[in-house]
Design a protein with these regions (language model features):
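Flexible, compositionally biased loop and terminal segments
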Residues: 1-167
Length: 167
């Protein structure tokens, strides 16, 4: 969903209109994934680097997220979509955290489509969080430094239980 604001600006529209159109693209993409039998889909929604945007744009993005969850959650659940949010919870408003938790809980047993939404996500942040969890395991003695392999490191990522993309 990166580039929605630039897309809108390039057409003389407000940036928020690009983000609104991005939400519509998400709806179409999820529908198509379900129709095609796609089992796993990951969408990047809000980067942890997006906090540097103007406050009004951040406000608009969060308002769109709230509206999307409130409007679409029941249909996603009805269609068997399992929702999972990856990224850090730090800095998110309490109502956003509740929406995330409610969506995750409601859809936890669904299996038609595993929809992972990277929200307040950044690759560097994920690597730092994985390294921190590994350091904790080493400090507790449950993992030795010699046990840290690329595969082991990957098992500490937010997406460790997702299939590795093959295309």
């Amino acid at each position: 969903m990166d580039g929605n604001g630039r897309w809108a600006e390039g057409r003389g529209l407000p940036r928020v209109e690009g983000h609104r159109r991005g939400v519509e693209s998400v709806r179409r993409t999820v529908k198509a994934a379900l129709e095609l039998g796609v089992t796993h889909l990951t969408l990047f929604s809000f980067s942890s680097e997006n906090w540097g945007r103007p406050k009004q744009e951040i406000h608009d993005l969060f308002a769109l997220m709230r509206r999307f969850v409130r409007r679409d959650l029941a249909d996603l659940h009805k269609n068997g979509v399992k929702i999972r949010i990856i990224g850090t919870r730090v800095g998110l408003d309490d109502d956003i955290l509740r929406l995330i938790d409610d969506a995750t809980l409601l859809t936890k047993n669904n299996s038609a489509l595993h929809l992972t939404i990277a929200f307040n996500y950044g690759a560097r942040d994920e690597i730092a969080r994985a390294a921190s969890r590994i350091a904790e395991a080493v400090a507790k003695g449950s993992l030795g430094p010699e046990d840290i392999t690329p595969e082991r490191f990957g098992s500490y990522h937010d997406t460790a239980d997702l299939p590795i993309p093959t295309c």
